[in-house]
Amino acid sequence: MRENTRAQRSVGFLLGLVDEETAVRVRARTGLPEPETPAQARGRVTRAWTWARGLEASVALWIMENDDPQLNALVWRYIPTDSGLRRAIARGVPFAAGRVDPLPVDVTLPGQEPEIPESYVRHGLVGALREVTTVHQGRAAASMVLTRADWATVGAADRERPLPGYARWALNVRPDCPPSVRAGFGTHAKFTHRLRQAGVFESAADYVASEGPAIRVLEVLSMGRLLFPARLKEAEDALRPLVDEHLGDREDAWAVLVQLAETFHGNTPELIVTAGAVA
């Protein structure tokens, strides 16, 4: 069976937000195929090189929240430059809420734990962070913050005496940095913008409104039931009102969306609004 194109998968995800009667009519009008079968979706997930390039840091974390060693091994190559998440995968650190037991590490994991920084060996977790004077040192020291207990320790240390700026920044751009700890590092609008540039989002709703191209976000969302089922509903709830208002049951608007999806440079909300306006 021929695999659906990126545009078909992306529009198909949005089409899943309307009622079945409308979806059937739109497919008949636009020629969109039926939704992927579970087997097709699983096959596409295993071909991570087709969707995981430039994977946003928060999306990588949401995938890791499944505590699935095979998924962890898949995303290993595509996790952003911060080595903290890679170290966590290599050590079997769990990320699902409430889980404390370590995970088995998949035999297909394509790499080893990053080197432990010398400053950590000499000074321990907080001591290494307090010694930071460069960006590189900050990233290295922050990569040793792995568990919930580690984050609690770091947050308490920063409240007692603020950590160096480079250390704070390296911790702040970790997608697994707890909101309570991140709040202590500052809430300036410029700071929030830099977090988004680093691929760190407070929620799935923020992710759907992130910078374009929209097809990049929609393709990842189209695999959300397998990659991050616990986060998908929030993304769907953020997009559904836009879909209802600007596309709804208008077959012509959906036809325009199909034409625009592959080449549109704006983000997902802008794509939806534009398709409705053009039609």
Residue spans of the language-model regions?
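Alpha-helical scaffold segments
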Residues: 1-279
